[in-house]
A protein has these predicted regions:
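Flexible, acidic/Gly-rich N-terminal and inter-domain linker regions that tether
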Residues: 1-103
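Conserved Radical SAM active-site core
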Residues: 92-94, 100-109, 114-140
Length: 140
């Protein structure tokens, strides 16, 4: 059985999920807070969730859809580029740019690009697919 991502689900969807698993709805709110407020990366970090529910979640769902494959820091400023691998073995890039009093993050929303700029390798591959909600969230 293929696991499903919990990231991208709303608080109501997580409440309904808990209810469908025969747990009180309020655990859905707790899970929502662990994912989006505390930014946990494992189900075992959810300290106020019943162990039985944690076991079910870890067997059926996952939290992180991207793996950091590499990162490179600019030699001239505080820019860092991350190469990330998706669950289906595709690659995307995310860039963190720190400048004066600002912090900008450039997120990918698609795998590939159809612009085909001469200087960019990504455009040569065309568009493979749009990223899912959890893949966009995981870039942050």
């Amino acid at each position: 059985m293929r696991k499903i991502s919990l990231k991208g689900l709303s608080e109501i969807e997580l409440q309904n999920l808990c209810e469908n698993l025969s747990f009180p709805k309020f655990h859905g709110t707790q899970i929502y807070e662990w994912i989006y407020k505390h930014k946990i990366d494992s189900f075992q970090s959810m300290q106020n969730i019943p162990k039985k529910l944690v076991k079910i979640l870890s067997e059926t769902y996952f939290l992180n859809s991207l793996k950091i494959k590499s990162s490179s820091k600019s030699k001239i400023d505080l820019t860092t580029k991350f190469l990330l691998e998706t669950h289906d073995n595709n690659f995307i890039e995310t860039v963190s740019i720190i400048d004066n009093n600002r912090h900008t993050v450039c997120l990918s929303s698609q795998i590939g690009c159809n612009v085909d700029c001469d200087f960019c390798a990504t455009g040569k591959m065309g568009i493979k697919r749009n990223l899912k909600t959890d893949e966009i969230i995981d870039q942050l």
